[in-house]
């Protein structure tokens, strides 16, 4: 029997390589390049230790093209790739959790996207914004969404929003546990 592989990718890996959040939070500011690594590693640790899931992590030093090449070389259609991000907007009132899927997502990707969206929003207490397709983003096409497996981008919250930033820092351990549990359920149901 094939064991589902979960691939967790930290978007914008490395300090100050992604969005940088507001500086008025009691916890400091979200540095997307750091927080995606922290969240990825914590979720993977829980998946391994508590649920016995097979988890593959991206290498923090690789460029996205290399990450995608490596993933393509080891996955099959039953596997699941989740890339973690923190959203940012010029409008500091933008808030909530989003999921991004390819233009033509599979039913399984939509199902997983809804589950991750709701799990994240519930764990953090953020608004459920939406599930978007890649063309509804400023980037138009996102390579990570074109793998030979189910692929989802999770925008955890808006680091440009003070409330989102504070509830993320206050609840990030709770979020990691909730995501790990949901991902373990996904892996066992596929």
Where are these regions (language model features)?
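Extracytoplasmic/secreted envelope proteins and their assembly/folding machinery
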Residues: 40, 44, 68, 97, ...
């Amino acid at each position: 029997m094939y064991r589902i592989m979960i691939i967790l990718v930290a978007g914008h890996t490395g300090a100050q390589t992604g969005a940088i959040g507001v500086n008025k939070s009691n916890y400091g500011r979200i540095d997307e390049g750091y927080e995606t690594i922290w969240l990825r590693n914590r979720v993977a640790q829980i998946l391994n230790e508590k649920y016995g899931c097979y988890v593959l992590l991206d290498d923090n030093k690789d460029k996205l093209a290399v990450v995608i090449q490596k993933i393509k070389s080891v996955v099959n259609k039953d596997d699941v790739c989740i890339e973690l991000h923190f959203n940012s907007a010029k409008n500091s009132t933008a808030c909530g959790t989003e999921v991004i899927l390819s233009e033509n997502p599979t039913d399984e990707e939509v199902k997983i996207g809804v589950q991750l969206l709701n799990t994240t929003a519930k764990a953090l207490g953020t608004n459920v914004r939406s599930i978007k397709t890649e063309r509804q983003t400023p980037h138009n096409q996102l390579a990570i969404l074109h793998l030979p497996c189910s692929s989802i981008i999770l925008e955890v919250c808006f680091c440009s929003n003070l409330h989102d930033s504070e509830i993320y820092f206050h609840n990030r351990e709770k979020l990691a546990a909730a995501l790990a549990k949901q991902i373990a359920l996904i892996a066992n149901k596929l």
